[in-house]
């Protein structure tokens, strides 16, 4: 079973994502901010980081950067309402990261997660 670390500060969106991913057969560890997600990542390995970009305490780009330092093989996907401006060329986000724009459709999310984990 694939393990996904989820960082999303919006409670409803986080519950929505957890339910969709668990129904698709993934094990999900949900967190409401980047700092707590990073602390969890330091405790155990995950195959994927699924994160919002704009969050309190530590934003998703910083979380992704640190996650890549801990585990260069971790797959990273951003889910954000700010997709158009989120990952410009000056961004410190990992180059292989995928971005999905909110609102995200469950079928698309699960499909993209499966594609990234299979790569």
What is the predicted role of each segment?
Residues 62, 83-101, 107-112:
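Alpha4 helix (beta4-alpha4-beta5 surface) of REC/receiver domains from two-component response regulators
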Residues 55:
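Receiver (REC) domain active-site loop signature in two-component systems and cognate sites
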Residues 25-32, 40:
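Short hydrophobic/Thr-rich beta-strand motif most characteristic of the beta2 strand and flanking loop
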Residues 33, 59-62:
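Acidic catalytic/metal-coordinating carboxylates
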Residues 8:
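Conserved acidic carboxylate
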Residues 52:
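Active-site residues of response regulator receiver
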Residues 12-23:
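Charged docking surfaces used in two-component/phosphorelay signaling
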């Amino acid at each position: 079973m694939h393990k996904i670390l989820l960082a999303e500060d919006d409670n409803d969106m986080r519950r929505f994502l957890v339910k969709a991913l668990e129904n698709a057969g993934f094990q999900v560890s949900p967190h409401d901010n980047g700092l707590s997600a990073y602390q969890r990542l330091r405790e155990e390995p995950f195959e994927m980081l699924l994160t919002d970009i704009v969050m309190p305490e530590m934003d998703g780009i910083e979380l992704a950067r640190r996650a890549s330092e801990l585990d260069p093989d971790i797959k990273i996907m951003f889910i954000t309402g700010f997709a158009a401006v989120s990952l410009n060329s000056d961004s410190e986000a990992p180059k292989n990261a995928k971005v999905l724009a909110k609102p995200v459709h469950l079928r698309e999310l699960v499909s993209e997660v499966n594609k990234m984990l299979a790569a």
